[in-house]
């Protein structure tokens, strides 16, 4: 294409050619066409930006699997983070090779390189995990605050697969059994015998929707003597899949009354 610009006398003067370059962030979820699958991204130019919604030093980020009937792998929690898109439209579970590699601070805006990273898609519900990351995959990290998050407020029944691995505020929910502690089990099953690594607590709303809030056995506020919050309110957390189609991971202790 040849461009011409008008001169001072109205004549047209040929302009030097120039290139307009537009960059955009790709949706790497589209790399997997089937209902489920896995692909290794080998592209030095592959990256995405998002906001960290988990906390690297928090004990209630990922359910810790039982590697044997009486053994729990606690390293999984420390190696896991959740990063959602800047607009909150969807998110990834991010699994680092080691806890030392996971330096993602809550609310920070990050740019993550996907070169050499494995993308896994799982179905029913549809969700995505990025694994095999090291500290070197973190291109940049800028501190942020809770106000940087796009607020997504929904009822339990309005949740969809797109909400998985994003931060959502659930309206007018309450605990079905708000008595005792968050983990009403024998503590001996936790640290001594390692039979139990996580306890779900049921939340429900006025529309009959239910969802489990997951509490790991290393969570400091699981049993601190102050009991559980009673009454209806808004509870915020990360939507995940664990046994049930959708569950909620709460990073900090729910406030009393139940508003956060």
Label each region the model flagged.
Residues 143-217:
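Short helix-loop boundary/capping segments
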Residues 103-124, 168-175, 230-245:
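Flexible glycine-rich surface loops and low-complexity tracts that mediate binding to linear polymers
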Residues 203-205, 209-247:
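Extracellular low-complexity, Gly/Ser/Thr-rich intrinsically disordered linkers
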Residues 84-156:
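Secretome/extracellular-domain signature
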Residues 1-72, 143-147:
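Acidic/polar, low-complexity intrinsically disordered N-terminal segments immediately downstream
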Residues 4-22, 30-34, 76-98, 116-120, ...:
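Secreted, disulfide-rich extracellular signaling modules
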Residues 249-260:
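Single conserved hydrophobic/aromatic residue that forms the stacking wall/gate
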Residues 54-93, 183-216:
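OB-fold (S1/OB) nucleic-acid-binding surfaces
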């Amino acid at each position: 294409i040849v461009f011409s610009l008008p001169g001072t006398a109205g004549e047209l003067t040929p302009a030097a050619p120039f290139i307009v370059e537009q960059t955009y962030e790709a949706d790497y979820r589209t790399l997997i066409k089937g209902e489920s699958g896995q692909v290794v991204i080998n592209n030095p130019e592959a990256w995405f930006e998002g906001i960290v919604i988990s906390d690297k030093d928090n004990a209630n980020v990922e359910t810790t699997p039982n590697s044997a009937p009486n053994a729990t792998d606690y390293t999984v929690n420390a190696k896991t983070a959740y990063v959602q898109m800047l607009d909150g439209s969807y998110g990834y579970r991010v699994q680092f090779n080691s806890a030392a590699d996971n330096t993602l601070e809550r609310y920070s805006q990050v740019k993550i390189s996907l070169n050499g990273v494995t993308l896994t898609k799982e179905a029913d519900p549809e969700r995505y995990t990025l694994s095999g990351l090291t500290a070197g995959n973190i291109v940049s990290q800028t501190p942020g605050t809770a106000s940087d998050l796009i607020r997504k407020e929904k009822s339990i029944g309005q949740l969809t697969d797109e909400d998985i691995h994003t931060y959502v505020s659930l309206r007018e929910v309450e605990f079905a059994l708000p008595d005792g502690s968050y983990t009403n089990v024998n503590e001996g099953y936790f640290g001594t015998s390692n039979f139990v690594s996580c306890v779900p607590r049921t939340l429900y709303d006025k529309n009959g929707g239910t969802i489990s809030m997951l509490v790991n056995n290393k969570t400091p506020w699981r049993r601190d003597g102050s009991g559980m919050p009673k009454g209806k309110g808004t509870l915020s957390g990360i939507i995940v899949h664990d046994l049930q189609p959708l569950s909620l991971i709460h990073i900090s202790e729910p406030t009393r009354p139940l508003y956060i």
